[in-house]
Amino acid sequence: MNITTADFFCSYSSLNGLPSDGRPEIVFVGRSNVGKSSLLNSLCARKGLAKTSSTPGKTRLINYFIINDNLYFVDLPGYGYAKVGQGERESWGKLLTGYIQKRGEIALVVLLVDSRHPGMASDLEMMEFLDYCGRPFGIVLTKWDKLKQAEKSKASRTIESCAPNARFIVNYSSLSGSGRDRLLASIDTFTQ
């Protein structure tokens, strides 16, 4: 897959009014501060396409980006952020689960996992939920450049044992772009 155009499309605070034009949706989900926005910017080679922040929980909406005018990348709010109120956390949870359960246009879910913390309970719960919903998913180990070689081997083994149903596992560095081509090729197989 070659990304020639990537533009912000729209943000949604509810499941009402989501695009109904039949374009496939590649969904990016993960814990708060896992690097979803940085990965999207790197993947699309567009700095600033998705707003990044060092503050967890910044993405609070469903953000749509139109790619090559024929598909959407969808950035979902992160899960697992403890510093928001219970009501807001529940609201995000309902938005996220409702979208994943009901959205017919989802072609693939890309689950981002911090390579420094593979196998966290919330990530394992998301994998189970995706399996329960029958959603094909792949895993991207983010922040790969922050690990030493021994840590990389351990992270890979851990995630492989935790995610037997993942269609692919890609090690990714948003800083260097390492893993970009492999991730794009993996996504491409679900948009044909």
From Swiss-Prot:
Its cofactor is Mg(2+). Residues 22-192 form the EngB-type G domain. The keyword Metal-binding applies. GTP binds at residues 30-37, 57-61, 75-78, 142-145, 172-174. Keywords: Cell cycle, Cell division, GTP-binding, Magnesium, Metal-binding, Nucleotide-binding, Septation. Necessary for normal cell division and for the maintenance of normal septation. This is Probable GTP-binding protein EngB. It comes from Chlorobaculum tepidum (strain ATCC 49652 / DSM 12025 / NBRC 103806 / TLS) (Chlorobium tepidum).
